[in-house]
UniProtKB/Swiss-Prot annotation:
Coiled coil: none annotated. It catalyses: S-sulfanyl-L-cysteinyl-[protein] + uridine(34) in tRNA + AH2 + ATP = 2-thiouridine(34) in tRNA + L-cysteinyl-[protein] + A + AMP + diphosphate + H(+). It comes from Chlorobium phaeobacteroides (strain BS1). This is tRNA-specific 2-thiouridylase MnmA. Residues 145-147, 304-305 are annotated as: Interaction with tRNA. It is found in: Cytoplasm. The record marks 124, 337 as: Interaction with tRNA. Belongs to the MnmA/TRMU family. Pfam families: tRNA_Me_trans, tRNA_Me_trans_C, tRNA_Me_trans_M. One of its GO terms (cellular component) is cytoplasm.
Amino acid sequence: MMKDKEHVIVGISGGVDSAVAACILIENGYRVTGLHIKVLDHSDDSLHLEKSPLIISDRKEFRFPVFSLNLSGSFRRDVIDYFLQDYLSGRTPNPCMVCNKLIKWKGLLKGADLLQATLVATGHYARIDCGREKCRLLKGTDSQKDQSYFLWMLSSEELSKTLLPVGNLTKQEVRELARRFGVRAAEKKESQEICFVPDNDYREVVKSSRPGLAEKLTGGEIIDTEGKVIGHHAGYPFYTIGQRKGLGISSPEPLYVNRLDPEKNRIRVGGKAMLQCRKLIAGQMNWTGISPPETSTRAAARIRYRDTGEACTIVPVEKERFEVIFDKPKQSVTPGQAVVFYRDDEVIGGGIIVEAISE
């Protein structure tokens, strides 16, 4: 990995992973500059960098300059507004992967341009393997921390300019390195929340964004698989596919949300078997490992972060849309989430789930 004094911009989040990534690069002979991207500053984007007082390590040899770049305006438009609109459209968004593409890498590459750096780096648990013709995105070595699912939107060109120094390490190894490097965040706990969703309660974020929305949608119908009204709900945006709790319905068998109907403010529920899907339709595709398939092709598909994957056939059905046919049914396929395709450890592409098909 060593390239003596090659200049790298490292995305600094304040956590242990990005700090260790920076220190690894320093130890390997890179010239490192940190970039902290501000996204919740309640102001518009800034086109200039500001010196940040952040100090990552207590050891002088692992100290480096850190700048901040304000992308709050872009974050509000490209991430928060998308997040809200998806819920209002009956979908379940994944803002972190959109943020990676449109905010983090946009900001890092902008910082690299302003500071005349050749590469960018982050603390993501994934790997990049660059050959003569292309760069491949691979799973991280630590299967419990692998974040390749969140990076499927990145282009081959973006991958070619990126280093992921902790991708071949386990979390325990990163903690151990952090202590050796004197990283101040060595013992910092990981946040499991979306950064703009307090207490991980997306419903309150949706409600506060649209005054009067909750009152307007309260009382919508809950129907069963035969169309019979069996209850009422608090508003379709506040439910997700596979949800069981909070329905307020008495039933001899557990009931789960299996469809949202924004036009009628209606949700449909049924037994667990109704969550099984053999197919899905995906759009907004990005292919990094292969060219867009013109005929059916095989892969393994993950439909959520912790999904272990399922063998499938990918079939082009129309421009920019593909049908994914699973070898075995998948549970709780959720429109708005990503389906990411793998061959062994390599991410070959992905897309956004448009429709789940139960037949």
